[in-house]
Regions:
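Extracytoplasmic loops and strand-loop junctions of Gram-negative outer membrane beta-barrel proteins
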Residues: 104-107, 153-160, 242-246, 287-290, ...
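Gram-negative bacterial Sec-dependent N-terminal signal peptides
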Residues: 2-29
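Outer-membrane beta-barrel "beta-signal"
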Residues: 444, 470-482
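Transmembrane beta-strand segments that form the barrel wall of outer-membrane beta-barrel proteins
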Residues: 187-196, 278, 317-323, 413-418, ...
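Outer membrane beta-barrel
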Residues: 107-145, 151-282, 296-314, 345-351, ...
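N-terminal periplasmic/intermembrane-space "pro-region" immediately following the signal or transit peptide
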Residues: 29-138
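Detector for outer-membrane/organellar transmembrane beta-barrel domains
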Residues: 310-432
Length: 482
């Protein structure tokens, strides 16, 4: 921009020297506001050049006056003009050099440095208010289903109820570090929020105090990652924008757990991920729909994922193999669980403001990977047989985002999940069988990092007995990201 302004000055000065009226002389170059000490130094040098321009203007005025009074010849006036033009050329060269030097200056670091380590603190403050109508029952106080969409907590078999709640529990904080070591970056990341901890009894009575809950914590070096992170079986970056904690939870893979993951770039936008992740088996008995946590797993879950990205799209396909295991009291069983997932994000339209996002997954014995355990991995009941009966699952969601303007946008989404229980053993009456939802929202970002949104969602839950429940929710959110 500085060079363009100076070229304009040069042209005007040369024209003025050859007889243009004084009214056409350009104004002094405006100084850009410095944003750093380096920019301040460059600005000072630019001001000195502007002073030289002012001297040149004075010389030109004297040349015109001399020509008008007959005290100098036309040759003298032309000589003065040439001298002024030469000065302008020299100034242009000097300013161009300054611009090049500024362009080559390193970008300001994101975060701050302590010793040889870069530190970054970030997150967001999110405030949510909602009005919910449950068509077939009511939730107990402190239930997470009051605060975000959790299909397994939609009541069934009761009278309709209405619930109003406001909170800031989805507020999130993280800090990360990066240290150069042997030509690679050694990184650490710790993240927590307040969303998934059970609300203390009486929390809303006065102070609304909530316990922080650990989300992610890992170290990475080069292509190796060790720690608690989103499962390799999904890509959380593909989830659609929503006022809700997740959005289409009923169709989502949703797991964070300990893992050892290795990423191998293959070129042309392809990456291969291989991971061994923390195992956990969730079961029901033939008479109770309460989830049983079994901690007798003997092998990690193994995941492989192939991911592709370019300027307008991101796609992945992943496979999961695991050992479903229950042992104790001299009894127990193992079974092979497996599944696959596909997902993606495709941007289109002016400035890529619109996008289509989707994910689908299916498998046997992988129920805990869907919707925070909407359905179990298996049914296990020692009173019937010392055997695991695996449950089949299919789930998916899709969304369409429309960017109406640079600051106004909407997302429309749908989610679905179905669990198929084995026929050879009884299924509890309240075991979750199916869930689906539809939602639409409108988001407005009046300034950078500040979002306001409103969303409507209709959802249905069905259980093995044939009972069903509905949920209708209008939710508003304000979010400041830092």
């Amino acid at each position: 921009m500085i060079a363009r302004r100076l070229r304009t000055l040069k042209a005007l000065l040369a024209a003025t020297a050859l007889a243009a009226p004084a009214a056409l002389m350009p104004a002094a170059v405006q100084a850009a506001t410095p944003s750093s000490s380096r920019e301040a130094e460059l600005e000072a040098r630019l001001l000195r050049l502007e002073a030289e321009m002012a001297d040149m203007k004075a010389a030109l005025r004297e040349a015109r006056q001399a020509a008008a009074q007959g005290t100098a010849t036309d040759d003298a006036a032309a000589q003065a003009a040439r001298a002024a033009e030469a000065k302008a050329d020299a100034a242009a060269v000097r300013i161009a050099a300054l611009e090049a030097k500024a362009a080559q200056a390193p970008a300001q670091p994101d975060g701050f440095r302590m010793g040889g380590t870069s530190w970054k603190l970030g997150g967001f403050v999110k405030v949510v208010g909602s009005v919910t109508r449950f068509g077939n029952g009511e939730l107990a106080g402190g239930s997470l289903g009051k605060e975000f969409f959790l299909p397994q907590q939609i009541p069934v078999g009761g009278a309709a109820s209405t619930d109003v709640i406001g909170h800031a529990r989805q507020t999130r904080l993280f800090f990360s570090t990066s240290t150069p070591v042997a030509g690679k970056e050694l990184k650490g990341h710790i993240e927590f929020d307040f969303a998934l901890a059970a609300a203390p009894l009486g929390a809303q009575r006065a102070t609304n105090a909530y316990t922080p809950t650990f989300r992610r914590g890992f170290i990475s070096y080069g292509n190796l990652l060790i720690g608690q992170e989103w499962t390799t079986f999904q890509n959380p970056a593909h989830l659609p924008e929503s006022t809700d904690f997740v959005g289409p939870m009923d169709g989502s893979v949703f797991v964070r757990q300990m893992m050892v993951q290795y990423r191998q770039p293959l070129g042309r936008g392809l990456d291969l991920y291989l991971a061994a992740e923390n195992p956990q088996t969730e079961t029901l008995t033939s008479t109770s729909a309460a989830m049983v946590d079994n901690d007798q797993d003997r092998m990690p879950d193994f995941v492989a994922k192939l991911a592709y990205h370019d300027k307008t799209k991101e796609l992945h396909i992943a496979g999961l193999v695991r050992s479903v295991s229950v042992h104790g009291g001299g009894m127990g069983d193992n079974a092979l669980g497996y599944g696959a997932s596909v997902g993606g994000k495709i941007m289109f339209g002016p400035g890529n403001r619109h996008d289509i996002r989707f994910m689908g997954a299916a498998g046997r014995g992988i129920g805990r990977y869907f919707t925070v355990g909407y359905a179990p991995d298996a049914i296990y009941d020692r009173t019937v047989a010392d055997r695991l009966y695996l449950v089949d699952n299919v789930a998916g969601w899709a969304s369409l985002k429309l960017g109406w303007t640079d600051s106004l946008r909407s997302t429309f989404m749908a989610g679905y999940q179905h669990a198929d229980y084995p026929d050879v053993i009884g299924t509890p009456a309240l075991a979750n069988v199916e869930a689906w939802s539809l939602a639409g929202n409108l988001f407005w970002s009046p300034v950078r990092n500040l979002d306001f949104g409103i969303e409507y969602r209709h959802a249905v839950r069905k259980v093995a007995s044939g009972l069903s429940g509905t949920m209708d929710r209008v939710e508003m959110a304000a979010k400041y990201t830092f």
